[in-house]
From Swiss-Prot:
The gene is nadE. Gene3D superfamilies: HUPs. This is NH(3)-dependent NAD(+) synthetase. It comes from Chlorobium phaeobacteroides (strain BS1). Keywords: ATP-binding, Ligase, Magnesium, Metal-binding, NAD, Nucleotide-binding. ATP binds at G36, L37, S38, G39, G40, I41, D42, S43, T138, K167, S189. Deamido-NAD(+) binds at R118.
Length: 277
């Protein structure tokens, strides 16, 4: 089995995602959207999809660099704004993040990165309240499964059109959508600190982990069958541990049940109520 099994009919995927964005925006009672545009491929795909679904005048892309952000990332984000014609704002988060850590020693890259991600989401939700725009997410399926993201940071949104697409599938969709090649081919990075890259953080490439996740989830193959197919035991065990350990990041907060009807457990109705009286 190779990564060819991950290939999708990207024209059909586009149609599904455009309808998804339009329908979900309408169900929530909104007409426009806001999202963070980093200069990476995930947010670039969301930018193009949102533009096609809602029209550029109804989409706001927010660029939120930190002082260590790569100038290339900022330029790539601006390139997407120019290409799509969506509205944009630039918010410098350095002051907020540095003030948070003022007098704090030994924070390290992980804590700094988490605060950057949450600062960005804070700005997005404030803009949502200011303008009446719905926040669209930009986390892909690989990130969500591995827990490679910040809870209530970059993983926070009202709707997420790309959350069921593996990273390698995002590249395929990006080329179908004619995203500039310099964004598609660049090394994936959350750009949280200088020299950071996704695959260096994770310790493996997206192609190999996407294939393993596909075997585990879509094909529901057993550990023994996956290893027999050529996946190393240590790699399988590492990835499975990450998926299991980060389950809490893919859930709403768990509520302790006390009463007969509990929100999220047995008090559940269709989200898109047609009338609220």
């Amino acid at each position: 089995m190779n990564t060819q099994c991950l290939h999708l009919n990207y024209a059909l995927v586009e149609d599904i995602l455009l309808a998804f964005i339009r329908n979900e925006i309408r169900k929530f009672g909104f007409r426009s959207a806001v999202f963070g545009l980093s200069g990476g491929i995930d947010s670039a795909v969301v930018c193009e999809l949102a533009k096609r679904a809602l029209g550029p005048e109804n989409v706001l892309a927010v660029l939120m660099p930190y002082r260590t952000s790569s100038p290339e990332s900022v330029n790539d984000a601006r390139l997407m704004v120019e290409k799509t014609g969506v509205r944009s704002e630039e918010v410098e988060i350095t002051g907020v993040v540095d003030a948070f850590f003022d007098g704090v020693s030994g924070a390290g890259n992980l804590r700094m990165g988490n605060v950057m991600a949450r600062a960005r989401m804070l700005y997005l939700y404030d803009i949502s309240a200011r303008d009446g725009r719905l926040v669209i997410g930009t986390s892909n399926k690989t990130e969500l499964l591995l827990g490679y993201g910040t809870l209530f940071g970059d993983m926070a949104s009202a709707v997420n059109p790309i959350g069921d697409l593996y990273k390698t599938q995002l590249w395929g969709l990006a080329r179908h959508l004619q995203i500039p090649e310099e964004l598609v081919s660049k090394i994936p990075s959350a750009d949280l600190w200088e020299g950071q890259s996704d695959e260096a953080d994770l310790g493996f490439g997206y192609g190999e982990v996407d294939l393993l996740l596909y075997m585990m989830l879509e094909k529901r193959m057993s550990r023994s069958d996956i290893i027999e197919a050529g996946i190393e035991e240590s790699f399988y065990d590492k990835v499975r541990k990450m998926v299991v350990r980060n389950q809490y990041k893919r859930m709403m907060p768990v509520i302790a049940k006390i009463s007969a009807r509990t929100p999220g457990i047995d008090f559940r109705y269709a989200r898109d109520w047609q009338e609220v009286k």
